Amino acid sequence: MRHGYNLPMEYWLSLSPLPGVILWILLYISDYYFTIYTARGFRDLGHFRFEGSFELTPQFQKDVDLLKPVSKRHIILLVLYSLLIVFIWWLTRQFYFFPWTYLFYLGMFLLMEVGIHLRHLRNASLIREMRKGGGLDGEIRYRKWFSYRISASEFYTFAALFFLFAILAYSPFFLGGAVMCFATGFQHSRLARKAKTSPVVMESNV
C-alpha cells in the first residue's frame, strides 16, 4: 500500500469522502435511536434513576428525556458534521499530507461512535435480559458525577485499545480514534469533578 499504511480499508476510505460520510450518517443516526431505545427501556424497567438526565451530552438531554423520535438539533449536527468530513477531505487533499491527515480525522469521527455503540449494545443487552427474566430487585440511583466517571473510564479503555491497533497496524485511522476517545474521556472526567461539587438536581427515571 502507498504512504506507509497497510490497511486496504484505509486506502478505500481515502479515495473519496463518500464512504466516510455514509458510515458517519449511519452511525450518528443509529447512535441517537439507540439512546432513545435504551432511555425508554430503563424507564420502563423502573429499577434505574439517573440524576439530571440519562443522556450525558448536554445539548441532547432535553430531547432524550422527552424521548423525541426526531431531534432537530441532531439533524442539524448530522448535516454539519457530514459537510465537515467532506471539507476535511478536500482540504487535506489540497494543502496537507494526504491521505494520512484525512484518515486521522475520519477516525476521530467514526471510532468514537464505534465506542459509543459498544456501550449502547451493552445497555440494550441488559434491558433485554431483565425483560426476559428479571434478575434485579430494588432501585439503583446513578449520581451524575458517577455516570460521567464511568463514561470516562470506558472512553479511556477504548482509547488504549485503538492506540494499540494504531501502533500494530501503523494506522492513522485508529490513531485518530484513540485521540478522540481520550479527549472525550478527559472531558467527562472534568465534568465528573464539576458535577460532584455541584448541588444535587432533580432525578430522572431515565
Model-derived regions, located:
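Hydrophobic alpha-helical segments at protein termini of multi-pass membrane proteins
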Residues: R2-V206
